[in-house]
Amino acid sequence: MARPKIALIGAGQIGGTLAHLAAIKELGDVVLFDIAEGTPQGKALDIAQSGPSEGFDAVMKGANSYEDIAGADVCIVTAGVPRKPGMSRDDLIGINLKVMKSVGEGIKAHAPNAFVICITNPLDAMVWALQQFSGLPPEKVVGMAGVLDSARFRHFLSVEFNVSMRDVTAFVLGGHGDTMVPLVRYSTVAGIPLPDLVQMGWTSQEKLDQIVQRTRDGGAEIVGLLKTGSAYYAPATSAIEMAEAYLKDQKRLLPCAAWVDGAFGLDGMYVGVPTIIGAGGIEKVVDIKLNADEQAMFDKSVDAVKGLVAACKGIEPSLA
């Protein structure tokens, strides 16, 4: 039985990290694609030469033609311009929309049966555009956002409580931006909800509110520190977690930017929600109940995503 084929579209910092992680986890053979000649080939060769020490046999290939992604089981899209200090994810919309058109057409022509994970920002609008341009079924095109935002939330909580992050569960709803909704009520430490931990004196409501805000600002904090780009280790591990759930039919409950039609009162749009990922792609959207405050924050986030989608339609007439 042949190993799965994983196509990584974009050979920048995230793309290179994805390739290395996919190899170490032996998820399949990897094609690293980029329009810059030499970059994907050089990174693929470098990663392949780590195989003898790491102990993996995955085949690494660098490519500049979409023909090389033919038959891919998974495509992870990182192509596009990253954020610089002072930029919001939304500032990237005009530039990266053109990239999504090219990528979508490439996937449609050469890997129409793939499970596609989009990482390019502004995430919720770009994954919608990518699905439109590729024509793939909505359950097979998804955005990596919630896994990353939830990982940041979990990290901050584990530091605050001085417990293993393996015992912290948390997830984040809504768009991948300033309006994201870290759900305190549904987040726990070893099954104990965060509001109960406040009552137990483990932390204060003020500190919890600060952690929620720091989660919202998580990407911008790293952009500000790096000054020359944006995060790549945590985004890559988050996308690999999603790819592994699909390739191994793990039925993982993971928050991500998925097509929602009916759940949460929405009538067809991409936004961050809890989902189950298995061999069918997005197999289920988990329609959790929100209280009035959570619903208000979620509605605000949904409106922000709708604004981005409207902007895309204004830029690219074929999407209108």
Curated annotation (Swiss-Prot):
Binding positions for substrate per the UniProt entry? 83, 89, 121, 152
Q: Keywords on this record?
A: NAD, Oxidoreductase, Tricarboxylic acid cycle
Reaction catalyzed:
(S)-malate + NAD(+) = oxaloacetate + NADH + H(+)
Q: What is this protein called?
A: Malate dehydrogenase
What top-tier enzyme class does this entry carry?
A: oxidoreductase
Record has Oxidoreductase as a keyword: yes
Q: Provide the family line.
A: Belongs to the LDH/MDH superfamily. MDH type 3 family.
Q: What does this protein do?
A: Catalyzes the reversible oxidation of malate to oxaloacetate.
Where is the catalytic site? 176
Keyword NAD attributed: yes
Kindly state a single biological-process term from the GO annotations of this entry. tricarboxylic acid cycle
Q: What is its EC number?
A: 1.1.1.37
**Source superkingdom:** Bacteria
Which residues are recorded as binding NAD(+)?
A: 10-15, 34, 96, 119-121
Disulfide pattern: none
